[in-house]
Amino acid sequence: MEKPWSGRFKEETDKFVEDFTESVSFDKELAFEDIEQDIAHVKTLQKAGILTEEEARELIQELLKIKEEIKEGKFQWKKELEDVHMNIEAELINRLGDVGRKLHTARSRNDQVATDEKLYLKKEIKEVLQLLKELRKTLVELAETTVDFVMPSYTHLQRAQPIRVAHYFLAYREILLKDSERLMDTYRRVDELPLGSGAVAGVDFPLDRFYTAELLGFNRVTRNSMYATAERDFIIEFLSNCALIAQHLSRLAEDLIIWNTEEFNFVELPDKLCTGSSIMPQKKNPDVLELIRGKTGRIYGNLIALLTTMKALPMAYNRDMQEDKEPLFDTLKNLKNMIKGMTLVLSDLRVKEQNMRKASGNFLLITDIANYLVEKGVPFRTAHHIAGSIVAYLLEKGKKLEEMTLEEFKQFSEKFEEDVFDILSPERAADRKRVYGGTAKEEILRIIEVAKAEEGL
């Protein structure tokens, strides 16, 4: 089959080269964006007087037919034509002859593919943002149902201080909100039209690039043709955002996996989202959460792969950049499933509030003892030392903090009074954290209302 660039060559392309260099097996994912761009390019060529009205009409008509054939799975992709762009153009030439041969006027595959990818990424960013919004809504709804429950917070995976369970879920809602803000910021940089930059230096024809941008829904036009065709920073930035989102989902998954163990027994996952063992009949494995955690490494790998591909390329376009698509497509497929999976898990999560509360007393209240002494006029560092001495005493005696008598408290400081027992409750300890952003119930209820308004609940 004759190649679109075959005029300079005297030999046919080796079969190995065709197989090794083809990208249509994966870049056909961009087919609809490529056709959308083709149609806008046709209209721009007509506006510039390069195509007649009739030629433009014929091209657009056939492009729309090809789009339907692709939708229906009837379009025949040929790897010997290398990529999605040449497959569609070759079919136009097959149907329209010389009119089809005019389509690629004032365009290179270099600015064409960058435009396709930006169109694709704009659409996909919006989809990821919507999935994140659904996950955040689920977290807010979960917070509403757990606002009266208390649990231990952890630092170094050691019990720290009592918090309301809702505070935990709202923390992840804040994290995912920042993820969405980063994606929206990335979208702003993606929203820039490369088409009209040609291979590297621009084009010789009087194209109205701002008209093309308007047709394709781009807010801005690239200001340098080399930059427009040489960079894949917009994909790398997006993959970096995805890696952060994956990291956050992985950390949440890790907590839920631990909480689901018999040793913690804080939550129970629904049967429909777990699997069993081929040998151990008792097993109920949290596979969805484990794969969310596992696929995070894959998403990191895709980011590192593209960073490494781009790190030493001479200016401007190089064929190495063909390797940007598979990491992008793979990351999107897996990240979207990870978000959907986490939303499903949280939507049907059973929180075991009694077990959480049982784990929230004793030494988790010792910081409140130190703060109690501070309120009685004891310097904090002294109060901290006294509270630490109480811990050592209780460990030696094999007692819990709640079992101490007033006489025992007074052995450590005369500042202790009967009211010390008022703070020996996980709920009261949590509710003393009334600072803005703290874990007090009144503050959590306020934040829930703010979150519901922001999420449209």
UniProtKB/Swiss-Prot annotation:
<dbReference type="InterPro" id="IPR022761">
    <property type="entry name" value="Fumarate_lyase_N"/>
</dbReference>
<keyword id="KW-0963">Cytoplasm</keyword>
<dbReference type="InterPro" id="IPR000362">
    <property type="entry name" value="Fumarate_lyase_fam"/>
</dbReference>
<comment type="similarity">
    <text>Belongs to the lyase 1 family. Argininosuccinate lyase subfamily.</text>
</comment>
<dbReference type="GO" id="GO:0005829">
    <property type="term" value="C:cytosol"/>
</dbReference>
<dbReference type="InterPro" id="IPR029419">
    <property type="entry name" value="Arg_succ_lyase_C"/>
</dbReference>
<dbReference type="GO" id="GO:0042450">
    <property type="term" value="P:arginine biosynthetic process via ornithine"/>
</dbReference>
<keyword id="KW-0456">Lyase</keyword>
<comment type="pathway">
    <text>Amino-acid biosynthesis; L-arginine biosynthesis; L-arginine from L-ornithine and carbamoyl phosphate: step 3/3.</text>
</comment>
<dbReference type="InterPro" id="IPR024083">
    <property type="entry name" value="Fumarase/histidase_N"/>
</dbReference>
<dbReference type="InterPro" id="IPR020557">
    <property type="entry name" value="Fumarate_lyase_CS"/>
</dbReference>
<protein>
    <recommendedName>
        <fullName>Argininosuccinate lyase</fullName>
        <ecNumber>4.3.2.1</ecNumber>
    </recommendedName>
</protein>
<keyword id="KW-0055">Arginine biosynthesis</keyword>
<dbReference type="Pfam" id="PF14698">
    <property type="entry name" value="ASL_C2"/>
</dbReference>
<dbReference type="GO" id="GO:0004056">
    <property type="term" value="F:argininosuccinate lyase activity"/>
</dbReference>
<keyword id="KW-0028">Amino-acid biosynthesis</keyword>
<dbReference type="Pfam" id="PF00206">
    <property type="entry name" value="Lyase_1"/>
</dbReference>
<dbReference type="GO" id="GO:0006526">
    <property type="term" value="P:L-arginine biosynthetic process"/>
</dbReference>
<dbReference type="InterPro" id="IPR008948">
    <property type="entry name" value="L-Aspartase-like"/>
</dbReference>
<dbReference type="InterPro" id="IPR009049">
    <property type="entry name" value="Argininosuccinate_lyase"/>
</dbReference>
